[in-house]
Each structure stands twice: as C-alpha cells, then as structure tokens.
Amino acid sequence: MSRPSLTRFLIEEQHAGRIDPELRQLITIVSRACKRISIAVSKGALGGVLGDAGTGNVQGEAQKKLDVLSNDILLEANAWGGHLAACASEEMDHSQPVPDQYPSGDFLLLFDPLDGSSNIDVNVSVGTIFSVLRAPKGTEKPGDEHFLQPGTQQVAAGYCIYGPSTMLVLTLGHGTHAFTLEREEGSFLLTQADMRVPEDTAEFAINMSNQRHWEPAMQAYVGDLLAGKDGARGKDFNMRWIASMVADVHRILTRGGIFIYPWDKKDAAKPGKLRLMYEANPMGMLVEQAGGAATTGRERILDIQPTQLHQRVPVFLGSKNEVAEATRYHVEFDKAQG
C-alpha cells in the first residue's frame, strides 16, 4: 500500500472540514518553498551559498548567505497566491504585506527561514520553522501589531528539517505528522502519523557552557539531572546538544527528551534567547499536539500574549512529565523568594 502524499493528506483534511482551501494552498506552497531550500542546502559548497552574507538581521546577528536565500525563497513563493495577507520573518525588521499587484488572503505567515544556520558550514542538520495565524477580520494591510497573537491562535505550525533526509513535520491542530521527501518523484509522503512524545525521559538537551550564568532554580534542576541515580532524581540522564533547534526538537519528537534554552545572566536584559513568534510558538504547538508540553519554566508558552514581533522567551519543551518537573523547580524557587 502506497504512502499518502502531503497533497492527499491536506485534501482529506479539507474534505473533513478541518481546514479551508486557502490554508491547504498555503501549506502546499510553503512545502514547495522548503523543497527549493532543501536543494540549496544539499549543494553545500558546490552551490556557492556557504559563508556569511556580510549583513546582519534585526537581532544583531550576522546573516549567512543561506539565511538570505531561504528568506527570499519563502517570500517569493507566498507573494502571489491570494491566500496570504502578510509575512513576518526572523530575518526582517518588520512584517511585509503581500505586494499590491497580488490578491490578499486571510492568513499571516511567520517563519525562521533557516534555523541553526550558524552550523551550516559544518554540515549539521538545519531547518525552516513556520507558524500560521489568521489575519484579524477587516484588516486590509496587516502591520506588526496584527501578528501579536498568542500561540493558542495558531491554525498551523511546522518545520522542515534538512538532514540525511528532508522531512516536513506539521500540525493543523489535530495531531503532529511527519512527511519525508521522496526525491525522485518530488513529493512529501506521510511516514509517521500522530507522533507521540513519551511522557517520561532520561535525556536532556541544553548548552552546558552557559551553566555559570543560570539562575539558582536552573542550577538546582540541572545539578539533580547530572547527579543521576545517586541524586534526588534517582536515575541517570544523558545529555544531547546539537545547537540546531530543529534537529534537537526533531529528536525529542521522535524519542522523547527535554529541550531547554533558559534565561541567563550573560545577557540579562533579554528575557531569553529564542524568539516567541518564530521558534517557541510553532515548536510549542507541534510538541503539545504530540502529547508533550512547552513552558518558559514558569508559564505555558502558547498562553503568552506577545508585545513585540521579535520578542524572546526562555524555552522548556518536550516530554510532559519532565517539563513539569523543570517548571516545578522554578515555581518553587519563586515562592521561596517571596
């Protein structure tokens, strides 16, 4: 029996009344753009797209050539279809409405065009993360303020990981599903329906080099993980860290674990490292739809009301019981501080 294609999956979701035709079209076009990005990534040095672009983004980060190329591919692909009202990207200062010469649709698309791009020159898996919101009714030209919706308002979220195989992981609010790109026919085929994150885990993903900058609750939590079976947790934990959020979260969706990027004192003015709208919200939705959890260490990520397009937050996501345990350390520390 042949595997269903992404196209068939989306049509069946539409026929079941779970999505409308415009959302189906949007996801289809995003998936096509991801195929183009996959081709560019896979060429590596042969494509002349490695290295720095010589520019910086709104975050103050140096852009890679592939950051810029991936951003342009997504903007171009989504400009003319009539399903989109505006786009916002981690690589752009402000949101961008569809050009005047094209029809405007009902949806807002946010994306990190190439997450983990700092690793691209060393051939580590990278990916594209995206989130879809509805444009507020009556909005003719959406601006940044119209994107400031909590993650609970997302109608779809996903990522495409460019690794040994190219995979699209998608949620439309009814489970999380994985599609693998069959390169010969150029189609994404369903390879894992209803992904489930195990509730318990013995793996954690964190950048330990920042340990000296963590707050006490974080120090205590990770200290107990490292103490293993001789400590308060009573079991050994393994650490995994790829430094590419897409790759780390994909592993957690596949076999469980907890991904942590906490607030730290190294840059105390920033509330976190990862972006709420482009990374935390879509990844949080994907993980929750797979039975996991996503918090800031103190509150559910999807409940946060954004105040800025490029807002940052701490991120704890993955296996439900372990995320709850990490959150407990922070809540109890706050109570003890009065």
From Swiss-Prot:
The keyword Iron-sulfur does not apply. SUPFAM superfamilies: Carbohydrate phosphatase (SSF56655). GO terms for molecular function: fructose 1,6-bisphosphate 1-phosphatase activity; magnesium ion binding. GO terms for cellular component: cytoplasm; cytosol. Its EC number is 3.1.3.11. Its main location: cytoplasm. Substrate binds at D115, G116, S117, S118, N207, K273. GO terms for biological process: fructose 1,6-bisphosphate metabolic process; fructose 6-phosphate metabolic process; fructose metabolic process; gluconeogenesis. Signal peptide: none annotated. It is found in: Cytoplasm. Its cofactor is Mg(2+). Mg(2+) 2 binds at D112, D115, E279. Mg(2+) 1 binds at E90, D112, L114. Binds 2 magnesium ions per subunit. Homotetramer. HAMAP family: FBPase_class1. PANTHER family: FRUCTOSE-1,6-BISPHOSPHATASE-RELATED, SEDOHEPTULOSE-1,7-BISPHOSPHATASE, CHLOROPLASTIC. This is Fructose-1,6-bisphosphatase class 1. It comes from Xanthomonas campestris pv. campestris (strain ATCC 33913 / DSM 3586 / NCPPB 528 / LMG 568 / P 25).
